[in-house]
């Protein structure tokens, strides 16, 4: 994210409910979303991890409607800084840290020709789209989209044939 994401936050005491400690130059302060700057329904699950100094916002500002980031895996909010929409989206993957599985999300951004510079946006969470994550290996494999480890993923999506089972017992891996 850009340092300007901190402009959407309000400094608070460390004991404030849902307060998150900042990073780097902001590490001595705790923050919550500023309800006057961030859209309703947003949340912070960790501090904003960004460079201390960056000219990127100034370079991008005039040519963009908004900036969408996903580096901070536990944050999901939208706000506006100097006419530019700043969007934070939590991780949608399962191979990294992040929010609880049913809160992992992707973000839908809708542009309407009647007001093209004011897109609508919403989080589409795993819990809302799919339901509770399963612990079945085949399902987890499909979500992670990673090659399975040894012994994981062998004939998980279809029942193995008799030949495949015999081959696995007497001379192979069962694949």
What are the residue ranges of the model-derived segments?
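His/acidic metal-ligating clusters that form di-metal
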Residues: 1-72
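Composition-driven, intrinsically disordered low-complexity tracts enriched in small residues
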Residues: 151-175
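Binuclear metal-dependent phosphoesterase catalytic core
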Residues: 33, 39-61, 75-158
